[in-house]
Amino acid sequence: MPNPVIHQPEHHRFVIIEDGAQALLEYRMLAPDVIDFVHTRTPAALRGRGLAAQLVVAGVGHAREQGWRVIGSCSYVAAWLEKHAG
């Protein structure tokens, strides 16, 4: 079962909390309708569980629901966007 992704707009991030640790996807708004995902972080204890992908799916999904253009400055996000383009 996927972990719940929590959007924390006041901190410009999406997070998953598991076993007291946080995996996160940070973003910045470049314009009112342009979001740039700048960083993903998954603590070593949480790696290999697909949490970064879950965060990107949630973040990109949120952006698309808003009608925003998505930029992936983070290399993980950029690779995910290229793989899932179309």
Functional labels for PLM-detected ranges:
Residues 12-22:
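Conserved beta-hairpin
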